[in-house]
């Protein structure tokens, strides 16, 4: 048995122990308070209540900042709601059809099901007998959350002095006053990026993965800017092996037209850099407009593998050309999420809020009633921090084609004049683990 197989077996046993511990009533007497005013009411809250109490008891942290506990509870709510919502709506519908719900209207019937059925732990156990995968997924989710939050707390304590020295300008801190942990997709057993606001007014970014790639990316960016008339701006990155900390980069507008021109000159350089590194997925969420500097805050998708297409039709021929061009990175305008000639621009240079996705996603309708059901809607894009602005006003990038072109040309010329040193510099990317983006490019035309 390999080490990985052994770890998987051990993990499965621990998740099973979570389920068995839940059956004993562990955590039932835990007291907690939800900030309903901030988060809004929760659907099927009596069902969630069982697992919030259990999750708090299992975390078993006596000294934990209030905002971290709030974040932990919020994650339990979001993840278990996502796992269980469809099943609970279906079971409520069955109870209604069998005449088991009491009430004069659909709202009262929902309240009855939520209170009398989901508040009864015996009923919860009956659901688990019918849906064993539901049980498995719920306790697996809690298991990962517990491990990930404990891991963060241990690392924050261990690295305290180093964070003060490197990211806090030597300003000491005692606690975290705000935590945001829903800013990225989760990977590798629920691990996700978090932004921590400390009581010294400094924000730090925690990433539960190696940041060797980010450090190499910034080092390479500094190297390329040697041939530029403008220097690149990097941000502080602390790589701790299998996790790391970063300086928080906040967007800000340009204060004059020259700064805006400088931004797009640097953007041209950025296009060249990511073309060389065969980077992709650098969409609007992964680039911050920091004054006259475009800052890539997630370089996890560099060094993408080239997937050879069969080129049996025009679509595959077009996709092959896109993959081999500067469009592949996602920095320049491109339309995604539709293969019918329509789509939305999610590029770092142009992606903006308010656009309607040309795809349908499920949303719950008639919330808080026994008629709850899924309906499919077109979601609307929300704002990001990728657009360069002048005193808060966005000016179309087409106005600055000359600057973009010049930045690209200067960086290209530097690379061509320093081929051997560039090849040597590329060795900093050896043995770096990157994220492979496997989306079908054909779906994005």
Give the ranges of each region predicted by the language model.
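Non-catalytic protein-protein interaction scaffold segments in large eukaryotic complex-forming proteins
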Residues: 1-86, 440
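Conserved ATP-binding subdomain of kinase catalytic cores across diverse folds
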Residues: 80-130, 148-277
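Short His/Asp/Glu-rich catalytic/ion-coordination signatures at enzyme active sites or charged loops
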Residues: 126-141
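General beta-strand recognition
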Residues: 205, 245, 295, 354, ...
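Conserved kinase catalytic-core segment
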Residues: 248-350
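Eukaryote-biased recognition of long, low-complexity, charge-rich segments
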Residues: 338-391, 396, 400
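Long, C-terminal catalytic modules of enzymes
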Residues: 399, 403-413, 417-433
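Conserved small/polar residues in nucleotide/adenosyl-binding loops
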Residues: 437-445
């Amino acid at each position: 048995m390999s080490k990985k197989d052994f770890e998987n077996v051990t993990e499965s046993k621990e998740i099973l122990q979570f389920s068995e511990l839940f059956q004993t009533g562990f955590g039932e007497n835990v007291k907690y308070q939800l900030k309903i005013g901030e988060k809004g009411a929760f659907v099927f809250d009596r069902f969630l209540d069982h697992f919030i109490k259990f999750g708090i008891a299992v975390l078993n942290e006596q000294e934990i900042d209030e905002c971290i506990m709030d974040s932990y509870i919020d994650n339990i709510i979001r993840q278990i709601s996502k796992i269980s919502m469809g099943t609970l709506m279906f079971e409520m519908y069955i109870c209604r059809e069998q005449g088991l719900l009491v009430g004069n209207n659909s709202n009262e019937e929902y309240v009855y099901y939520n209170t009398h059925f989901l508040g009864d732990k015996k009923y919860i156990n009956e659901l688990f007998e019918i849906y064993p995968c539901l049980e498995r997924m719920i306790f697996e989710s809690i298991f990962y959350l517990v491990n990930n939050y404990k891991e963060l707390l241990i690392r924050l304590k261990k690295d305290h002095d180093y964070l003060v020295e490197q990211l806090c300008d030597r300003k000491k801190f005692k606690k975290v006053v705000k935590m945001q942990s829903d800013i990225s997709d989760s990977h590798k057993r629920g691990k996700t990026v978090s932004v921590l606001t400390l009581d010294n007014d400094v924000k730090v970014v925690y990433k539960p993965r190696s940041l060797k790639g980010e450090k190499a990316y910034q080092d390479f960016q500094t190297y390329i800017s040697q041939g530029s008339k403008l220097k690149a701006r990097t941000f502080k990155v602390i790589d701790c092996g299998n996790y790391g900390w970063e300086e928080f980069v906040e967007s800000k507008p340009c204060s004059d037209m020259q700064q805006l021109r400088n931004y797009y000159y640097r953007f041209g350089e950025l296009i060249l850099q990511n073309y060389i590194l065969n980077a992709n997925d650098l969409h609007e969420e992964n680039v911050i407009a920091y004054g006259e500097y475009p800052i890539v805050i997630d370089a996890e998708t560099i060094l993408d593998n080239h997937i050879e297409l069969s080129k049996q039709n025009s679509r595959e021929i077009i996709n092959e050309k896109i993959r081999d061009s500067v469009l592949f990175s996602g920095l320049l305008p491109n339309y995604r999420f539709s293969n019918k000639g329509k789509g939305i621009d999610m590029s770092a240079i142009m992606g903006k809020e308010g656009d309607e996705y040309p795809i349908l996603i499920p949303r719950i309708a008639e919330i808080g009633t026994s008629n709850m059901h899924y309906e499919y809607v077109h979601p609307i894009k929300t704002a990001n921090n990728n657009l360069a602005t002048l005193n808060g006003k966005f000016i179309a990038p087409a106005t600055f084609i000359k600057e973009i072109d010049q930045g690209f040309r200067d960086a290209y010329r530097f690379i061509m004049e320093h081929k051997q040193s560039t090849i040597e510099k590329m060795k900093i990317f050896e043995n770096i683990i990157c994220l492979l983006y496997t989306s079908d490019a054909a779906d994005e035309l």
